[in-house]
Every structure is written in C-alpha cells, then in structure tokens.
C-alpha cells in the first residue's frame, strides 16, 4: 500500500502508518512506501534520503530496505510464492467524473490516436522515413495524456496549451498522411459499414460538413474509387412522429427520445421506458469537483424545454435526419437523429452551446433486454460488468469507463452504443446511460463551456456483441476513410486486429503489432516466416504460424 496521497516526506510516523495499514501481513510479502514531493513537486530531498538510511538502525521502526520499484516487485514475488491475487477490475470508488470532464479534449485525443496509427502505417507503405518526426509528435501527445491533463482536472491555461498542442500534432499528422487518388482502407478487414465521406457537393451534412453516406465495400488494406450512388427517397415514411425504414418502425417524441423502437428484421420491440432521453442532473460533488460524480447525482433533474419539436430537416437516398432543438435557462441543445437505408445503426448528433454550472448531461436508454451483465470496450479487448445492484460493491459501480462501445445483450439479440469520444457510462438493470457533458468549476471555472459537436450510434443487433462484429463496426466508426495511393503486400492477419504497423525503434525492420479483441483463441498460418518479438521489439524467435489466445497482444518483425 503506497501512501494515501501524492506527497510523503518520509517521516517515521508515515512509515509506521503505512505498515499498520498493511492488512495482509499473515500472507507474507512487503509493503512499498514511496516518498518525495509529488504532483509536480520535484521528488525527494536530501533530508528524506538521510532519514531513509537511518530507519534500519532504529529498533522501534519496521524493517526498512531501500530499493527501486522494479526490484521491489521482483523480490516480493520471488520471496512470496503464495501471495493472493486479484482477478478482474480494480474499481476506484472515486474520480468517476474524469471519464467525462473536458469533452472536447477527450474527443480530439480519440481522433489523434487513430491518426497516429494511419500516419505510421502510410509512412511504412510509402517507404518514407518519418519515424523521428512521429516519435517527437508522440512525446508531445503523451505528455498531454499525463495526470490531470487528459482526465480534465486541470486549470484553464493547461486546457489552452493542450488544445494548441493537439492542433499542432494534427496538422503535422495530416501532412504525413497526405492524400491520393483512391480511398485506402487502413483496417485489416473489409470495410462494409456505412460511412460518411466528405464532398462539398454532397447531399448530406455531418459535423457541419457536406458529404455523402455510402457503404464503401473496400477489402482489407486495399484501395478503391468511391462514388455515391443515387437512390430514390421513397425508402422511408414519416408521419405523426413515426418513421418506418427497412430496419425499424420507430415512434419518437418531440424531444428526440423514443417511445417505441420496433425491429422489423428481428420482429421485436427494444424500448422499455426512456430511450435516447437527454437528461441533465445537478452535479455538485464538493471538493473534488472536476474529479468526482456522487452516487446521488440523480436526486435533482434540470428541466429541459423543447424549442423546436422533432421534424425532418434533411433526407436523401441513404439517410433521413430528424431535428429537434432543446434548451435550459443557459444552454441550447440541437439533436439530430439519423436513420439509414443500408445500416441498422441509428446515429445521434448533438450540437451543444453549453453554459452550465455543476451539471451532468446523460443520454439514457431503457431497453427490454433481460441480462445481468454488460460488455465494455477497452483499448485491446473488452471487460464484462454486472448491471444489477444487489451489493454495495455493485451499487458503487454506477459510473464506469469504456472506450469505443458498450453492449447489453440477452440470448439472441442486444443493443450496443458506439461513440467517437465518450468514456463514461452507467448500467442499472436494463438501462444504459452514456455521459455526454459535465460543467464543473474547480479547478477550471470555465470547464467545458462553449460549443460541442459529437455523435454516438445506437446499434441493435442479433446475437451478442462478438457475433454481431460490434468491435469492427466501432473501429470503422472511429477510423475515417483516407485517400492514399499505397499497396499492402503483407498478410491481413485476420481475425486479429492490426493494432499498428510501424518502423522499428532500433532498426530498419517493419514492426506489426496485433491484438485479439474478441476473447477467442486459434492460429493463423502465414505464407512466410516472420520474427516473433516482445513488446520492446526484441527478437525472441521466428515463426510461420501465429498461435493466439484471448486478448493477447502479439508483436512481429517483417
């Protein structure tokens, strides 16, 4: 157990308190006490080091030994073979608000993560030597993921600096990515999910940009010329708030929420109460304003008025968009609900002028799915979480972290929520709630104030999240199509996900990093022999067969 805060001056009383707080003495092992002025405070001092050298000579003190963190862990595991282990999520019952605070920062971080992947890949395929430039961009990017920056718990000048850095990084990556005559699929599986392709002459609008909705149908790691086909607009009907499409018959309320979502393909209803319902709560967690959300945040709900009832604002042969304008006393919220001719997804775009104080905005989805678990996407896999609230531990997990998607399924069918930069989500019985915006005042009184534009997609599906390929759909939702004239000569490595293709840090070798993201095992027979590497890109063997296990990360050299 480390000290309880980020500053420890190595006083004898702190050492004693640390030892007394260590409750597993009967299991053996040691406890670590890290000392120094933390949180940007410059670390340990000479006085602290001198105290450390004297502790071992005092009989009234616990036995102390000075060593580094790696040495401590190695020695502790070697000397104590029977140490108890924890399997599963270590859930911190605080700082839940950091999943949501500073929405624009988190959204831009997500976009840049995918742009780094694209820039590295295209540099390798073009034979360009951009590694040193990309490395410097990575360093600046990772500094802004540091404690208090990406979580949003920082003062306003930090936010301004971070967004300026992100703009600089994005411009440099865009220059590396460049352009071409054809659209290149950077994903190592067929790109078959509906996508928005910018086009100044397009008939649709998204994020304020004109373009077209189309199904690319581009094979893995291949290029293709895309042209929007023209279709008649008679693929849907809309009357008195009810829309019928090839996939759904949905009844919507004036505020954009659903009173019914009937699945024409699966012959079932999906809703059971408020579905796609925007709710704004009073959010006043006290001392740790930007950090925390309290369990009682639902006690007071803020009234939302409908300024413009839901109505069709745009439609073509692929997409129909319904628009409603909502407001509070201080903020304006435009919600655009999109249905598609060729996709089961229902996209919701939110254009928000946000000027609140101590507020939490959520989109809530009460479904009729019977389940006690939900799946949440992570950076290279997913984690399973309980949705019922029988115990105090379950009740404490009212807000959890996820990445690109979350899912609730029963046998045969379920619903996923796919996002482009939202990380906080709650589960309560059969209800999912996606956290959208916060309005904290400490340590930044202007936190999240201003303009926001973000989307999420509701994705009902047959089967479960794995069999419905939700992860592939979410990857396509987050990885924009790019124009590039390149050719791929390596295997596609399906069904593993191509996490990265990059130049080696220490040689001219090309490094391929793969991850298994569906919890399965198997093997891939390659048409060549490749080097098997560890995560540090050190060679550990050669192979022509990749044997993989659930959620394994594999690094190869070619």
Residue spans for each PLM region:
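A broad, structural surface signal
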Residues: 50-57, 71-74, 117-124, 132-143, ...
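Histidine-centered catalytic/metal-binding microenvironments
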Residues: 113-203, 207-219, 501, 507, ...
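Aromatic/acidic polysaccharide-binding cleft in carbohydrate-active enzymes
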Residues: 41-43, 69-165, 425-465
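C-terminal (or distal) subdomains of carbohydrate-active enzymes
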Residues: 2-20, 58-60, 70, 81, ...
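The substrate-binding groove and active-site-proximal loops of carbohydrate-active enzymes
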Residues: 2-13, 33-45, 155-156
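Conserved short loop/turn motifs at secondary-structure junctions
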Residues: 36-41, 155-164, 184, 352-353, ...
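C-terminal domain-boundary segment and adjacent tail
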Residues: 26-99, 167, 171, 487-492, ...
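Conserved alpha/beta enzyme-core scaffolds, especially Rossmann-like or related mixed alpha/beta domains
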Residues: 1, 27-37, 66, 140, ...
């Amino acid at each position: 157990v480390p000290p309880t805060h980020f500053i420890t001056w190595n006083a004898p009383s702190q050492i004693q308190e640390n030892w007394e707080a260590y409750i597993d003495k009967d299991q053996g092992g040691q406890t670590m006490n890290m000392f120094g002025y933390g949180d940007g405070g410059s670390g340990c001092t000479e006085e602290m080091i001198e105290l450390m050298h004297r502790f071992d000579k005092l009989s009234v003190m616990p036995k102390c030994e000075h060593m580094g963190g790696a040495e401590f862990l190695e020695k502790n595991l070697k000397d104590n073979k029977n140490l108890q282990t924890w399997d599963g999520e270590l859930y911190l019952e605080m700082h839940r608000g950091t999943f949501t605070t500073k929405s624009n920062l988190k959204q831009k971080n997500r976009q840049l993560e995918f742009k780094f992947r694209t820039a590295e890949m295209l540099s390798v395929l073009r034979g360009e030597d951009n590694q040193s430039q990309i490395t410097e961009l990575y360093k600046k990017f990772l500094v802004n993921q540091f404690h208090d920056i990406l979580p949003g718990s920082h003062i306003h000048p930090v936010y301004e600096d971070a967004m300026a850095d992100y703009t600089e990084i994005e411009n440099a990556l865009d220059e590396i990515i460049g352009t071409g005559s054809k659209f290149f699929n950077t994903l190592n599986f067929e790109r078959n999910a509906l996508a928005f392709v910018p086009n100044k002459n397009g008939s649709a609008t998204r994020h304020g940009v004109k373009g077209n909705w189309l199904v690319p149908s581009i094979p893995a790691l291949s290029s293709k010329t895309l042209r929007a086909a023209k279709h008649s607009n008679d693929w849907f009907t809309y009357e008195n708030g009810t829309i019928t499409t090839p996939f759904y018959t949905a009844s919507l309320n004036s505020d954009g929420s659903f009173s019914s979502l009937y699945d024409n393909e699966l012959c079932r209803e999906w809703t059971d109460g408020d579905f796609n319902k925007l709710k704004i709560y009073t959010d006043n967690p006290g001392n740790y304003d930007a950090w925390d959300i309290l369990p009682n945040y639902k006690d007071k709900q803020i009234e939302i008025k409908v300024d413009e009832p839901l109505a069709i604002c745009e439609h073509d042969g692929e997409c129909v968009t319904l628009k409603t304008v909502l407001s509070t006393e201080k903020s304006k919220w435009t919600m655009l609900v999109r249905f598609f001719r060729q996709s089961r997804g229902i996209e919701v775009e939110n254009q928000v002028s946000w000027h609140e104080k101590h507020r939490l905005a959520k989109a809530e989805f009460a479904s009729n799915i019977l389940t006690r678990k939900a799946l949440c996407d992570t950076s290279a896999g997913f984690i399973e979480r309980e949705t019922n609230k029988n115990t105090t531990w379950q009740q404490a997990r009212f807000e959890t972290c996820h990445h690109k998607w979350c899912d609730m399924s029963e046998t045969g069918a379920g619903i996923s929520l796919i996002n482009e930069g939202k990380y906080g989500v709650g589960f309560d019985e059969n209800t999912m709630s996606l956290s959208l915006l916060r309005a904290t005042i400490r340590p930044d009184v202007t936190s999240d104030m201003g303009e926001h534009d973000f989307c999420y997609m509701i994705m009902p599906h047959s089967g479960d999240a794995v069999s419905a390929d939700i992860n592939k759909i979410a990857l396509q939702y987050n990885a924009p199509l790019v124009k590039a004239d390149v050719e791929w000569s390596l295997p596609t490595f399906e069904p593993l996900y191509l996490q990265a293709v990059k130049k080696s840090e220490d040689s001219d070798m090309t490094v391929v990093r793969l991850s298994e993201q569906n919890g399965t095992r198997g093997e891939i027979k390659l048409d060549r022999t490749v080097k098997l590497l560890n995560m540090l890109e050190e060679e550990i063997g050669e192979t022509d067969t990749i044997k993989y296990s659930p959620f394994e990360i594999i690094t190869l050299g070619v």
